Design a protein with these regions (language model features):
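C-terminal coupling/interaction segments
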Residues: 274-320
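Conserved protein kinase catalytic domain
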Residues: 82, 126, 229, 249, ...
């Protein structure tokens, strides 16, 4: 992981005009991405992830604020930025009539590579992404996972310093998603900085060295996955009772081992110290008041707990 910042933004904003008035899709985003990291932008659909990514990739001008990529200002030196980056949109961008090899060679030629060099580079990418056997087949015959890997390869033809990936595993089955994670880790191992957007909690947790959680165009938390989860103290205990949930919260919130107690979608959610030791005490207290839990689950804090703590909403339900 690097220490120098290859991406920096300061108070980045983007406003769109709408019938109901101006909509600020990106509302003062300030962040830094270290060279060689996998950086994740985690948030629900409509949070401002893709808009921010498009600004950094010079596809959309910011309304205000500053952003630099590889030392170049995205607004004032976009051509220099584009030579340092690869960009893979969620929808991809490959031509369905061409073969995988042809698409890679075409991309290399667009970056002024000689034909022979582009052909060599195409073969390197096909081998690295395990697409060599399908290299001369039309892309229309590729599976979703193969097309996604090819699109990443297209973004890597010119060996960019930074690769932007917009929701790289959306729509993939679990096996294809796990394989894509391995490919992204390989990019980091080769020295490429990866900036990806995702609404998958497990993806952000498994892949990212650092991440920022964004909601309504604003960053609400940032750090490594473990640092963020440590912000949610103790264990998370969720209790389902038949009615009287507010009474249960009042009974439990003042216990010495309960850090926080609240209601979420009809369930009592507690943040407790040493949850396995707390459960017997809680059960005895509820039983003494004639209350019998219908369900009870205990888990370590997750990134969803971080999102819930910062926004009052569950990212799993928001993204569903």
């Amino acid at each position: 992981m690097g220490s120098e910042q290859i991406i920096e933004t300061r108070d980045l904003r983007r406003t769109f005009k709408a019938k109901a008035g101006a909509v600020e899709a990106v509302a003062g985003v300030t962040l830094g991405v270290a060279t060689g990291d996998i950086f994740g932008f985690l948030g629900p659909n409509g949070a401002g992830k893709t808009t921010t990514l498009r600004i950094l990739a010079t596809l959309l001008p910011p309304t205000s604020g500053e952003a630099t990529v590889a030392g170049f200002d995205v607004a004032h030196r976009p051509d220099q930025v584009r030579r340092q980056i690869g960009y893979v949109a969620q929808s991809g961008g490959s031509y369905r009539g061409a073969t995988g090899r042809e698409e890679l060679v075409i991309q290399g030629r667009l970056f002024d590579m000689r034909k022979a060099d582009a052909q060599v580079r195409a073969q390197e990418i096909l081998d690295a992404l395990d697409l060599a056997e399908a290299a001369d087949r039309p892309c229309s015959t590729y599976s979703g996972g193969m097309r996604r890997r090819l699109n990443i390869g297209i973004g890597m033809v010119h060996r960019p310093a930074v690769l932007f990936l917009d929701e790289p595993t959306t729509g993939l089955d679990p096996q294809a998603r796990a394989r894509m994670w391995d490919e992204i880790r390989s990019l980091r191992a080769s020295g490429t900085t990866v900036f990806l957007t995702t609404h998958y909690l497990e993806e952000a947790d498994a892949l990212c060295d650092q991440l920022a959680i964004i909601d309504h165009g604003r960053i609400v938390a940032e750090g490594s996955p473990n640092e963020l989860k440590r912000q949610v103290a103790g264990d998370v205990l969720t209790i389902g009772v038949d009615g009287e949930t507010e009474r249960v919260v009042l009974l439990l919130r003042n216990l010495p081992f309960v850090r926080e107690a609240n209601l979420e979608d009809g369930l009592v959610r507690l943040y407790v110290d040493r949850g396995d030791e707390a459960i017997p005490h809680i059960l005895r207290l509820l039983d003494g008041h004639g209350l019998a839990p219908q369900t009870m689950s205990l888990h370590r804090p997750s990134l969803d707990d971080v999102f819930l703590k910062q926004t009052g909403r569950s990212l799993r339900e928001t993204a569903a």
